[in-house]
Amino acid sequence: MMFFSERGTPVVAPISGHVVTIGDVDEPIFSGRVIGDGVAIVPSDGKVVAPISGVVSFIGEQKHTYGIVGYDGIEVLIHLGIGTVRLEGEGFTPAVQVGAKVEVGAPICTMDLELMRAKQFDLTCPVVITSAAMDKVKRLTLLTGPALAGQTVCMRYVPVKA
């Protein structure tokens, strides 16, 4: 399902928790918007769902990053935790494969928050429109506060007209 309106296309929270600005992330590659622009979520639950409808474009080798390209060509990146690449996949259980078509709210992964807390990882999950896709975005609106996975809109974008 695709949503279009004057206010823009919604991107829902892929994980329940509290949405903060990307500038609040304690990792310069995200807070500096090097990879893209968006928000971050401090998770309260480990169930991760698709924030947009589209096709899974990649899954990081360590299972901590997921990309979904929407049917309008805009790519959203979900990065599960900060420094979690060092877990080498431990604590992440993918529910999709690259090339899978997903709808908003479809399960894409489960992350073991207790394991990550025990190993003292920062659980903050950046959710960004990738730098390459930002060239196709005319306007991006970011929304912060409490969020429910698959339900709460955390961003809206207006694509550049072709």
Where are these regions (language model features)?
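Contiguous, well-folded functional domains in the mature portion of proteins
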Residues: 1-162
